[in-house]
């Protein structure tokens, strides 16, 4: 049965609980343990699938089609363990499950209350798969004291109480603010955060203290005394140049040892951190630099493209080169022109929804095609590349997407991209209507693409004729225009196994121009970069040498 580590936060949000959880999972793996990481989000949305990227950041999609928090991306990148639907839950999902059970009569006429019905639902979620791994790391979103988070804190308190003391521990992440006027770190916010946590029945075993300045030993001792933890369980967490330094930094600070001590695991297996030392070597000793323009709709918030940013870093590691990614607002291209892309060694157009900014994406695809600049179009980025080719090469000047017509409420375009109403998933066929609810109704999760032998995409994947990547879309390039587009030079080099859905397009006469309907960035890891991103950066390096 798994040991449980509950990671909570206090003082302020966005302190890095997700990264701390991912780094701790990686450190436990380095000691030979198996791990799984989970995220419990107190917001009332059922999942983040319908939330604005400006509100929530990226939606991370799992192999089995769950739309989850971007922290699950950190979990996967650091541990290599593929997340599942059962690794992410929100208050909305919990309450939805409880109400569905009430309607079915599952509670036998009882009055439904937060305790025990909601807390029991949360505990049932925590217990799924507990026999599969050595450690289950569960991050609670938000901060202690948030009203919407109280049922989760109560549930983990009960969960720990119902198990042996040596089976559950609590790690609490707090902030030590620096007061410039007095030139000192202040521990009082941490003390009050722990006081708040203890008031709901949870006593932290390990404190992780975020700080911009070194934490003196006397301050660590003071925190330990007032918060009732061991001095060596007060772990400093400083700002780092790269998130991939976190496992090594937390190991030096003693986080993994403090956790094992709290579980009374002795002697603790020695860690093998070779993998992370190699990652840092590739980052710190990179030679040269390539400049990449990411032309998107949500560039004001980099977290909206978190996996893109990390996959570019991984591609740089694979080629031992630094990647400088600039976030270019696609609407700005519409107003100021594609000359804004001059000087870049590669262009990425990532996914998105809605018509806003898409003419700028189309302009970026045209610029890359005509200037022979490496281009990677992802999801919407592939669709915009197809529309650009249809308009300017295949004699369809009014080519566009049904998505834009549906948004405007009138027909304006020849729909080379159409609303996907049916597709094969496993052994059955999924059917969708335009009037369906938005949440959870897209083509989600891992799907196979069958590749054309000898195509560039096949070469990138070492000659593979089938690849599998994750998807998140409800619009698709219409295969009925395939012959017309291929005659214009745009090759359909990857299709769904039934031959109905285009998965990959590429230009035969271009050094490197590929569009994919999937999201290969979601499976990229620092020690296993996504082949498409490694190949894209390699092509950008070739372009840099030509400039």
Curated annotation (Swiss-Prot):
The keyword Ligase applies. Keywords: ATP-binding, Glutamine amidotransferase, Ligase, Magnesium, Metal-binding, Nucleotide-binding, Pyrimidine biosynthesis. Residues 291-546 form the Glutamine amidotransferase type-1 domain. Its EC number is 6.3.4.2. It comes from the Bacteria. InterPro entries: Class_I_gatase-like, CTP_synthase, CTP_synthase_N, GATASE, GATase1_CTP_Synthase, P-loop_NTPase. Allosterically activated by GTP, when glutamine is the substrate; GTP has no effect on the reaction when ammonia is the substrate. The allosteric effector GTP functions by stabilizing the protein conformation that binds the tetrahedral intermediate(s) formed during glutamine hydrolysis. Inhibited by the product CTP, via allosteric rather than competitive inhibition. CTP binds at residues 13, 146-148, 186-191, 222. Residues 1-265 are annotated as: Amidoligase domain. GO terms for molecular function: ATP binding; CTP synthase activity; glutaminase activity; identical protein binding; metal ion binding. PROSITE patterns: GATASE_TYPE_1. The active site is at residues 379, 519, 521. GO terms for biological process: 'de novo' CTP biosynthetic process; pyrimidine nucleobase biosynthetic process. Gene3D superfamilies: 3.40.50.880, P-loop containing nucleotide triphosphate hydrolases (3.40.50.300). L-glutamine binds at residues 352, 380-383, 403, 474. It is an enzyme of class 6 (ligase). Belongs to the CTP synthase family. CTPSs have evolved a hybrid strategy for distinguishing between UTP and CTP. The overlapping regions of the product feedback inhibitory and substrate sites recognize a common feature in both compounds, the triphosphate moiety. To differentiate isosteric substrate and product pyrimidine rings, an additional pocket far from the expected kinase/ligase catalytic site, specifically recognizes the cytosine and ribose portions of the product inhibitor. Homotetramer. This is CTP synthase. It comes from Paracoccus denitrificans (strain Pd 1222). The lineage of its organism: Bacteria, Pseudomonadati, Pseudomonadota, Alphaproteobacteria, Rhodobacterales.
